[in-house]
Amino acid sequence: MPQNDYIEEHIRRHGRRLDHEERQRKRAAREVHKASAVAQKVTGLKAKMLNKKRRNEKIQMKKTLKAHEERDVKQASTSSDPNQALPTYLLDREGQKDAKALSSAVKERRKDKAARYSVPLPQVRGIAEDEAFKVIKTGKRKQKGWKRMVTKPTFVGESFTRKPPKLERFIRPMGLRYNKAHVTHPELKASFNLPIVGVKKNPQSPLYTQLGVLTKGTIIEVNVSELGMTTTTGKVVWGKYAQVTNNPENDGCVNAVLLLSS
């Protein structure tokens, strides 16, 4: 084996290739696919050794993530100097130990904002991908299967423009598109047929939210301007969140309950 550093010497003298960073980036991106292919093909003792190695890597990764999370948390410091005198107005306060310069007050405010709404359905059944999407065969020989047709009801906005058919991956049928929902006001005990403004959150996955899939437990935004709701300053409320409480694919309509801030 060579004992000298001729490679490093050449790099110092002549530099690297012009596309060195691009090649490194592509190589790093390929490593994931190579590791996946090896994990699927390997068997026997090599598979056991690989699984053990991956398990140790995941454990180490979880420990690192936990350490980062603990670094961000503000803790009360118990190691205060008892000999140090404190003013009277500071005696009832706990010493704060900042792990970061950023205050955790912003995070607490976000948590409080998220807890303002009590959701009628906190848990829903998971939907498999085979249940929500149907494979569409394309191509001259009908051998390509990269297109999917959404088999669940969806909401498509007025400003939506279809892609060219050769580039459209997800197809949302016109017969399964809904623009209005039967929204029940929990305090008034009355239902209103309100237009849907958008899909805020689908509990299944971000892809379902992006496609506007309406399943049980989905948080939608509805236009409540005709209800005459106002804010404390007297402004008319235009949009409110509501949660879908039924299975629209079975009932043929969207039923939802209005989410009111507590």
Swiss-Prot record:
Subcellular location, record wording: Nucleus, Nucleolus
First-listed, main subcellular location of the protein, grouped into a coarse class: nucleus
InterPro entries: NSA2_fam, Ribosomal_Se8/biogenesis_NSA2
GO BP terms in the entry: maturation of 5.8S rRNA; maturation of 5.8S rRNA from tricistronic rRNA transcript (SSU-rRNA, 5.8S rRNA, LSU-rRNA); maturation of LSU-rRNA; maturation of LSU-rRNA from tricistronic rRNA transcript (SSU-rRNA, 5.8S rRNA, LSU-rRNA)
Entry keyword set: Nucleus, Ribonucleoprotein, Ribosome biogenesis, rRNA processing
Polar residues biased stretches: 75-85
Positions occupied by motif Nuclear localization signal 1: 11-18
Subunit structure of this chain's protein: Component of the pre-66S ribosomal particle. Interacts with NOP7 and RRP1. Interacts with RSA4 (via WD repeats).
Name the record gives this protein: Ribosome biogenesis protein NSA2
The species this protein was found in: Mycosarcoma maydis (Corn smut fungus)
Gene: NSA2
